[in-house]
UniProtKB/Swiss-Prot annotation:
GO biological process: mitochondrial electron transport, ubiquinol to cytochrome c
Other comment: Heme 1 (or BL or b562) is low-potential and absorbs at about 562 nm, and heme 2 (or BH or b566) is high-potential and absorbs at about 566 nm.
Name assigned to this protein: Cytochrome b
Gene: MT-CYB
Chain positions recorded as heme b b566 binding sites: 97, 196
Known outcome of mutating residue 327 to V: In strain: Isolate Emaj614
Signal peptide limits: none
Keyword hit for Aminoacyl-tRNA synthetase: no
PANTHER family: CYTOCHROME B (PTHR19271:SF16)
Annotated keywords: Electron transport, Heme, Iron, Membrane, Metal-binding, Mitochondrion, Mitochondrion inner membrane, Respiratory chain, Transmembrane, Transmembrane helix, Transport, Ubiquinone
Gene Ontology MF terms: metal ion binding; ubiquinol-cytochrome-c reductase activity
SUPFAM superfamilies with a match to the protein in the record: a domain/subunit of cytochrome bc1 complex (Ubiquinol-cytochrome c reductase), Transmembrane di-heme cytochromes
Length: 380
């Protein structure tokens, strides 16, 4: 008799995706973050659903409803902080996942890579809208500043901004629609994740060496299910520690002040995971130029497969590009720090230099390093 998991139409799909999936035998712990992202997404949808049961998307009651969740709902504080810090975990895993793809040349599976970039944009949009919902000072002013950037679009900009706002300023209509979008987007993300996995399983996973591993594959279960469970346990340990010991560590104190359109906070800044892009936006004195740089800071990832000049896929055997890669990581950390600093000397010039370096490494230095390494190895 055939095993039911191999014959049942639905179980067959799950079997081919998570059980009998042929997987390279040498993938390292850097490959754990895909499954961790899946866990983060499930956690965010689950906690978000319970928060939505108690939240009200009205400007007069939104702030109070979040306070009510924390004070009066059973374990409401736990659900709220799991959701808020879960978003930070989500982005930590996302950045490592993208960084792994860049380091080991996984971007050569172009469909999977492009789907991942679309997912990154979708998650960033969801997180931005979620940050507006508690209706604190930073929620309100963050929404005002970021949506206002669209007014830089020639001719239709102002009309577009007012259309998104649902009026002449960020108000009740804006909050209601942001709540609606924040609720629906994670389910769209789930669908996109399925497409992402569909493309991935067409080609199979890459591995640290960047070489074809068809000759040496092992089943995903039990080897990598066990390995993923260890990753999940470590993720939960980190998340629970953050939630129970320092729940507001990554938040902004300004968001504990109810939104006030008449009082601007001294430093408007987004959550930590957007600071690198915010620093790039601020480093350009022109509004439209800044908006384009902001979008390109993520969209530039789509160019990476087309700028791959080396005959070796992974950076494992390419020390020159490896050095550039780690300079890029350091540069992103500098941009993150600059994004949280006030707009004054010396932070302005540091931000501008770091922004130029970010684009230069990806667009110029890495492709050049690939060609230099090929010529050193006499592979051209």
């Amino acid at each position: 008799m055939t095993n039911i998991r191999k014959s049942h139409p639905l179980l067959k799909i799950i079997n081919h995706s998570f059980i009998d999936l042929p997987t390279p035998s040498n993938i390292s712990s850097w490959w754990n973050f895909g499954s961790l992202l899946g866990i983060c997404l499930i956690l965010q949808i689950a906690t978000g659903l319970f928060l939505a049961m108690h939240y009200t998307s009205d400007t007069t009651t939104a702030f109070s409803s979040v306070t009510h969740i924390c004070r009066d709902v059973n374990y409401g504080w736990l659900i709220r902080y799991l959701h808020a810090n879960g978003a930070s975990m989500f982005f930590i895993c996302l950045f490592i996942h993208v960084g792994r793809g860049m380091y080991y040349g996984s971007y050569m599976s172009i469909e999977t890579w492009n789907m991942g970039i679309i997912l990154l944009f979708a998650v960033m949009a969801t997180a931005f809208m979620g940050y507006v919902l508690p209706w604190g000072q930073m929620s309100f002013w963050g929404a005002t500043v970021i949506t206002n950037l669209l007014s830089a679009i020639p001719y239709i900009g102002t009309t577009l901004v007012e259309w998104i706002w649902g009026g002449f300023s960020v108000d009740k209509a804006t909050l209601t629609r942001f709540f609606a979008f924040h609720f629906i987007l994670p389910f769209i993300i789930v669908a996109l994740v399925m497409v992402h996995l569909l493309f991935l399983h067409e080609t199979g996973s890459n591995n640290p060496s960047g070489l074809n591993s068809d000759a040496d594959k092992i089943p995903f279960h039990p080897y990598y299910t066990i390995k993923d469970i260890l990753g999940v346990l470590l993720l939960f340990l980190f998340l629970i520690s953050l939630v129970l010991f320092a729940p507001d560590l990554l938040g902004d104190p300004d968001n504990y002040t109810p939104a006030n359109p008449l009082n601007t906070p001294p430093h408007i800044k987004p959550e930590w995971y957007f600071l690198f892009a915010y620093a790039i936006l601020r480093s350009i004195p022109n509004k439209l130029g800044g908006v384009l740089a902001l979008i390109l800071s993520i969209l530039v990832l789509a160019l990476i497969p087309h700028l791959h000049t080396s005959k070796l896929q992974s950076l494992m055997f390419r020390p020159l590009t490896q050095a550039l890669y780690w300079i890029l990581v350091a540069d992103l950390l500098i941009l993150t720090w600059i994004g949280g600093q006030p707009v004054e000397y010396p932070f302005i010039i540091i931000g501008q230099l770091a922004s130029v370096l970010y684009f230069a490494i990806i667009l110029i230095f890495m492709p050049m390093a690939g060609m230099i390494e090929d010529s050193i190895l006499k592979m051209d």
